[in-house]
Amino acid sequence: MQVSVETTQGLGRRVTITVAADIIESAVKSELVNAAKKVRIDGFRKGKVPMNVVAQRYGASVRQDVLGDLMQRNFVDAIIKEKINPVGAPNYIPGEYAVGGDFTYSVEFEVYPEVELKGLDAIEVEKPVVEVTDADVDTMLETLRKQQATWKETDRAAAAEDRVTIDFTGSIDGEVFEGGKASDFVLAMGQNRMIPGFEDGVVGHKAGEEFTIDVNFPEDYHAENLKGKAAQFAIVLKKVEERELPELTEEFIKRFGVADGSQEGLRAEVRKNMERELKGAVRNRVKTQVLDGLINANEIDVPAALIDGEIDVLRRQAAQRFGGNEKQAQELPRELFEEQAKRRVVIGLLLGEVISSNELKADEARVNALIEEMASAYEDPQEVIEFYGKNKELLNNMRNVALEEQAVETVLAKAKVVEKSVSFNELMNQTATA
């Protein structure tokens, strides 16, 4: 077997292999002998068909199969010998072949990039320092009460966090635009569901009033024909409702899994959940900065085959979220996922090198701690822990999470870390908008 390797472009490689004629003929003869033992041909007993008859009947197809098998086996031998690490499915390109002669063919494929990490000590990370205060717990309790609130109709003027029922008709230059009209529209104010200025124009009016408000659509509004346009809305205010918050009674508190129904127990449970969320938010905030720094410091070529594979994964995930099937997943535009797919591939390659060069292995104690932390959010944590223990795939997934964390911490140990005190709400708002 003769082998030559050349670079086509970037990570592209072409291996050219020549298989000697005697190797081919020996393999063909061996396969024909095996075939002669199995084939049935009229006029001959099984296993007694003469070789020349078998060769005449099956020789061409056997030779084709032999060449295909030799192409694959010799390619594998070649990349092992040349220490080549291919990515994705190779493209086999057969050359001209005449019976009795050598056979030359090519295989084109991509290889993994050589990654040599650099600039780790120049990565800058701002680590949030946060604690859950009593005031934070008070705010969260108020949020829980608002989520469980009921609505009561009122005669007073609408306020910023009321719920209103309205009819409205929107127009631009006197012409009603598509989607600008609704009847009995229920609007919970204070949630920024409408364009800027709309809710402000409703505040101060009472049920039964008819009025108009002038607003401007944002420049980045999703509808192209409305971007930046001045509009007028004619509004009929039909109903104003105010929120009635539930008292922190024993019955109310027990809804949140606090067995004794005490306010102290509820505060403790809320604080525990907030601290768990906080821990995850800090971890993710730091991780994002580490990964951004790692990517910026290490520009690498990315195999197209890996990006294509990741795009397929993202397509399927997107389709599943919206109840789609495999066919619908493949119809989703590639451009929607290309940037995210490339980032994920780059991160995987860089962290893979961190893991390899530092000989990292998943810390089982960390794996167990991650499972326990995740399970603590469920009603029966022990049941979740036992479920993970019995499910090999889930357990391996958690090992990968732990190993990734260890790789991030390895990079973080070499980075420039500055601590910054922030409030709970500030951090969680940053996380929500990231």
Swiss-Prot record:
One of its GO terms (molecular function) is ribosome binding. It is found in: Cytoplasm. It comes from Pectobacterium carotovorum subsp. carotovorum (strain PC1). InterPro entries: PPIase_dom_sf, PPIase_FKBP_dom, Trig_fac, Trigger_fac_C, Trigger_fac_C_sf, Trigger_fac_ribosome-bd_bac, Trigger_fac_ribosome-bd_sf, Trigger_fact/SurA_dom_sf. GO terms for cellular component: cytoplasm. Consists of 3 domains; the N-terminus binds the ribosome, the middle domain has PPIase activity, while the C-terminus has intrinsic chaperone activity on its own. HAMAP family: Trigger_factor_Tig (MF_00303). Keywords: Cell cycle, Cell division, Chaperone, Cytoplasm, Isomerase, Rotamase. Belongs to the FKBP-type PPIase family. Tig subfamily. Involved in protein export. Acts as a chaperone by maintaining the newly synthesized protein in an open conformation. Functions as a peptidyl-prolyl cis-trans isomerase. It catalyses: [protein]-peptidylproline (omega=180) = [protein]-peptidylproline (omega=0). It is an enzyme of class 5 (isomerase). It comes from the Bacteria. It holds the Pfam family Trigger_C. GO terms for biological process: 'de novo' cotranslational protein folding; cell division; chaperone-mediated protein folding; protein transport; protein unfolding. Signal peptide: none annotated. This is Trigger factor. Residues 161-246 form the PPIase FKBP-type domain. Its EC number is 5.2.1.8.
